[in-house]
């Protein structure tokens, strides 16, 4: 059985962020996935966002989820671009202000969930 590596990169904090990684394996019983979380805490600068995305790349995820408030800001943008440039399929989870970046995310091939 192939174990799928799932990475969660948290840049800043949105209300649903503490629950995201548990949606896939709440009881830690699944043997077909391996989950890692890397967070910047409250910081959302481009430099910190790139740092946490690069830390996630050390895990070599099969795909990643980047959560942040306002995904249109430079920090969250840099995090997802870092993962994309490394060839990691990425889904963005963000809040309403991220709607400003929907077209950009679609054109770049990112999946996204906007929590209102």
Language-model segment annotations:
Residues 1-90:
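Metallocofactor- and cofactor-centric catalytic cores in central/energy metabolism, strongly enriched
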Residues 93, 115-116:
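Generic beta-sheet signal
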Residues 95-112:
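Glycine-rich, charge-decorated loop segments at or immediately adjacent to ligand/cofactor-binding or catalytic sites
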């Amino acid at each position: 059985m192939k174990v799928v590596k799932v990475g969660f990169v948290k840049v800043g904090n949105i209300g649903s962020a503490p629950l995201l990684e548990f949606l896939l394996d709440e009881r830690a019983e699944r043997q077909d996935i391996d989950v890692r979380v890397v967070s910047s805490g409250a910081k959302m600068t481009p430099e910190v966002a790139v740092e946490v995305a690069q830390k996630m790349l050390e895990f070599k995820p099969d795909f990643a989820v980047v959560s942040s408030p306002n995904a249109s800001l430079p920090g969250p943008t840099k995090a997802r671009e870092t993962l994309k440039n490394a060839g990691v399929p990425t889904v963005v989870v963000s809040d309403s202000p991220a709607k400003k970046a929907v077209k950009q995310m679609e054109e770049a091939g990112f999946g996204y969930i906007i929590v209102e």
